[in-house]
Amino acid sequence: MENMEKVVYLDNAATTACAPEVLAVMVEALSGACGNPSSHYSVGYEAKEFVDAGRAQVAKAINASPAEIFFTGCGSEADNWAVKGSAFTKARQNKKHLITSAFEHHAIMHSMAALERLGFEVTYIKPTAEGYIRPEDVEAAIRPDTALVSIMMANNEIGTIQPINEIAAIAHKHGVWMHTDAVQAVGAIPVDVKELGVDMLSMSAHKFNGPKGMGALYCKKGVWPQNLIDGGSQEARHRAGTENVAGIAGMGKALEIATTHLGERMAHEQQLRDYVIDRILKNIPEARLNGGVEHRLPGNVNISFPGLEGETILLDLDMHGICASTGSACNSDSLDPSHVLLSIGVPEEIGHGSMRFTFGPQNTMEEAKYLCDVLEEVIPRRRAMSCMWLQGQNKARQFSLKGEQ
């Protein structure tokens, strides 16, 4: 088997390359709009036009008003602002209880932990074995002092999509604010804040072929989480700091492109996803898919290969020119098992052998087939050298022999 001549990038959940049209508008903003968008003269007005245009594009993509879009430095900042800002606002009403899931992104998990250290209480909802949050479990956890429910729209590791509209309706029935981390969803599947019924929604530009270091928080009119960054009057006095004009322009353009061709993109990515899942589960013994298929991001594949370490597979794939991951890029330096996989009941030893492959619009069926070719060669070869795999096979044979006696 020969390596492909180009790098095969299959880690689109970690980040994506800027689209050419995005780079073009960013260069235009950087070179032609040198003023401060808060300044009241012509050069400042030119910069503000880029900010206003980007805000309008983001708002249109999720069916919001431009006045409901607040730009941040990243998706993690948007998550921190939604969670901590809501907690601090509601604490003034003696509401110091929050609800989230046990498999959120670390931006949510660590924000919740920080609030717990300040005396807040947090309930962590356990997902089902297929990776879904049951709305009835959320309702059962709501208390009179509940300030916020924060459940991610789509999981960043296993790609499962949550029933956010049902959960939001339950939260509102009890007078509770609802936030969703939609960083993996925006630009990948349809996102309509009115249909979802959420009060706050986080997004990140580099997940949909926009620039890194650029995010946004949607806040429904009348919902104001307390500021985390104080200073000037930018972002309607809710998030201080001179705006990243080029970043905002790039984010708006990227989301406009992503949502314009969303149906085609989803169908294409799902075709690649399903091909890889079907072929790997058929041809590699004991490979297991993590997360359900019915409500799953179209480009997400997360598969465990028992008897191996994910880092070993990762190195082999890299030698064949394939970029993938063992889980969230935000936690890639840790050798601890994925909290996402543990939360859905994947045993620790199997979770260590999990790989995430995430497709984007630029990927091809040729690349999907090449990935399967490489895995079908690498996994058996590595297992033949794996003490963990061989010991497991010996135990299985011994159990089988005992059953025949």
Task: Label every model-predicted segment.
Residues M1-Q405:
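Pyridoxal 5′-phosphate
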